From Swiss-Prot:
Regulation: Allosterically activated by GTP, when glutamine is the substrate; GTP has no effect on the reaction when ammonia is the substrate. The allosteric effector GTP functions by stabilizing the protein conformation that binds the tetrahedral intermediate(s) formed during glutamine hydrolysis. Inhibited by the product CTP, via allosteric rather than competitive inhibition.
EC number(s) on file: 6.3.4.2
Residues annotated to bind ATP: 15-20, 72, 239-241
Transmembrane segments: none
Name of the protein: CTP synthase
Pathway recorded for this protein: Pyrimidine metabolism; CTP biosynthesis via de novo pathway; CTP from UDP: step 2/2
Keyword annotations: ATP-binding, Glutamine amidotransferase, Ligase, Magnesium, Metal-binding, Nucleotide-binding, Pyrimidine biosynthesis
Record gene name: pyrG
Organism listed in the record: Aliivibrio fischeri (strain MJ11)
GO cellular component, one term: cytosol
Chain segments carrying region Amidoligase domain: 1-266
Residue numbers binding Mg(2+): 72, 140
Role: Catalyzes the ATP-dependent amination of UTP to CTP with either L-glutamine or ammonia as the source of nitrogen. Regulates intracellular CTP levels through interactions with the four ribonucleotide triphosphates.
EC class (word): ligase
Family: Belongs to the CTP synthase family.
Length: 546
């Protein structure tokens, strides 16, 4: 299969939405029957984002095969059906580490290792490898044109485009066209300078996607086309919209997919966007409102919980409910008390690391349990629910996780020292293991108990969900918890690790060790989130059995 490539770059400012624009184009091409994949090239020196602060980088998205990747891969999976893998995201740090490892082995036979050709060749090899087996690969380069960090990546895609030829490679560049209120007009000069910067490194864009807070009129598009050396029909106006799921239609309406197919000589049927039309309809026509309290420690940057945010919205679509997320700092719960949780229709405690704010999360779980508020715990959110139950129901005074308290008498959560990974290999860890890449990662099989809420929601005896954690329920103390009424409704493939817990005498209290948010999409939703938001809606209407 011959693969064609679309390289996506950004200019003027960061956070323009390259990932969303690229994923939207991919969604249209997929809707035309083409096999599409996406890649994200990150210029930072970290080997992967796994150990980066969520408040700086945003969430870490985990793929089926256990790669810790950029949050843009979450956008990719929410827009297209193709599942991402470790081949779909790599960093400058990963490339340099691989090249240096080869140099130490003597693979380069004594050559002087340089950015060109060794680093650029390594980048090209990874891009080609990740694109195999697809009609089109859309490759997004992180950062902004002109950044020194991204130069090796820009050079690599320039070389690759030359090697592939014009019939197999094209460039799409995102820029900002700001509106100056004082002058009362849109300004195209930043876009012109951005393209000039791109030209200086040998790249001529074929499509310009121009971000603005309003539709860019034809005369301004004509001006941009003239000064940036692109066809007028290839200047795409991408105005701000109230939902990212409207962007595929916005791009399709301007013929962007036709430009791609014409360039690559592809004959494909017209895109069927009926699924996206349904998503937009559901989003625009809710029948009620719910307020979900998200009690976390990284709330100053909502992108730290990007997939959770989106999964709640998806569940809202499926239930025809408008979901408002109220972010609650878990440290505020510690200092101000659970009064700040009053008025919430449901409570969600997401994953996290470290002991800062953990007692606030425990209090949130207690509040939800005692006041019969629907509760969904994810990863650490399950662990704090377990700790709270142990302390206040199972009479295990001072119960805690060994992550936060080494000398607790009841370590109901402890370090996993051995487990089977997604490929069936036995993994072992100790307290001295490196932090990066040493967690239980990727898709794992889970057995669901008969008669459980989890099994009712999923409708299956087994499911596969993605994990990212190094602490688990202590099986030695599990009998005492179960005797006190806790229900274990999900177990790992070998039935040795607890994956889901429930409280039977509560209207809706479910917590999972895995991350269900990573597999939720706007078209399909996710059973746990759908059930959770449904319970919140029933709570609002007074229909929830207390």
């Amino acid at each position: 299969m011959t693969t064609n490539y679309i390289f996506v770059t950004g200019g003027v400012v960061s956070s323009l939405g390259k990932g969303i624009a690229a994923a939207s184009l991919a969604a249209i091409l997929e809707a035309r029957g083409l096999k599409v994949t996406m890649m994200k090239l990150d210029p930072y020196i970290n080997v992967d984002p796994g150990t980066m602060s969520p408040t700086q980088h945003g969430e870490v998205f985990v793929t089926e095969d256990g790669a810790e990747t950029d949050l843009d891969l979450g956008h990719y999976e929410r827009f297209i059906r193709t599942k991402m893998t470790k081949r779909n995201n790599f960093t400058a740090g990963r490339v340099y580490a691989d090249v240096l490892r080869k140099e130490r082995r003597g693979d380069y036979l004594g050559a002087t290792i340089q950015v060109i050709p060794h680093i650029t060749n390594a980048i090209k090899e990874r891009v080609i490898s990740g694109a195999e087996g697809h009609d089109i690969a859309i490759v997004e380069v992180g950062g902004t044109v002109g950044d020194i960090e991204s130069l090796p990546f820009m050079e690599a895609i320039r070389q690759l485009a030359v090697e592939l030829g014009r019939e197999r490679a094209m460039f799409m560049h995102l820029t900002l066209v700001p509106y100056l209120g004082a002058a009362g007009e849109l300004k195209t000069k930043p876009t012109q300078h951005s393209v000039k910067e791109l030209l200086s490194i040998g790249i001529q864009p074929d499509i310009l996607v121009c971000r603005s807070d309003r539709v860019i009129p034809a005369n301004e598009r004509k001006k941009i086309a003239l000064f940036c050396n692109v066809q007028e029909k290839a200047v795409i106006s991408m105005k701000d919209v109230d939902s990212i799921y409207k962007i595929p239609q916005l791009i399709k309406a301007q013929g962007t997919d036709d430009l791609v197919c014409q360039r690559f000589g592809i004959t494909a049927p017209e895109a069927d966007l009926s699924e996206w039309e349904q998503v937009i309809y559901e989003e625009a026509n809710p029948t009620g409102d719910v307020v979900i309290g998200m009690v976390g420690k990284y709330i100053e940057l909502p992108d730290a919980y990007k997939s959770v945010n989106e999964a709640l919205k998806h569940a809202g679509l499926k239930n025809r409910l408008n979901v408002t997320i109220k972010y609650v700092d878990s440290q505020d719960v510690e200092s101000k008390g659970t009064e700040i949780l009053e008025g919430l229709d449901a409570i969600l405690v997401p994953g996290g690391f470290g002991d800062r704010g953990v007692e606030g999360k425990i209090l949130a779980a207690q509040y939800a349990r005692e006041n019969k508020v629907p509760y969904l715990g994810i990863c650490l959110g399950m662990q704090v629910a377990l700790i709270e139950y142990a302390r206040n129901v199972a009479n295990m005074e001072g119960a805690h996780s060994s992550e936060f308290s080494k000398d607790t008498k009841f370590p109901v959560v402890g370090l996993i020292t051995e487990w089977i990974d997604s490929e069936g290999n036995v993994e072992e860890r100790t307290e001295k293991s490196d932090l990066g890449g040493t967690m239980r990662l990727g898709s794992q099989l889970c057995h669901l108990a008969k008669g459980s809420k989890a099994r009712e929601l999923y409708g299956n005896a087994t499911v596969e969900e993605r994990h990212r954690h190094r602490y688990e329920v202590n099986n030695n103390l599990l009998p005492q918890l179960e005797k006190a009424g806790l229900k274990v409704s999900g177990l790992s493939a070998d039935k040795k690790l607890v994956e889901i817990i429930e409280i039977p005498n509560h209207p809706w209290f479910v917590a999972a060790q895995f991350h269900p948010e990573f597999t939720s999409t706007p078209r399909d939703g996710h059973p746990l989130f759908e059930g959770f938001v449904k319970a919140a809606g029933e709570s609002v209407r007074g229909e929830l059995e207390k």
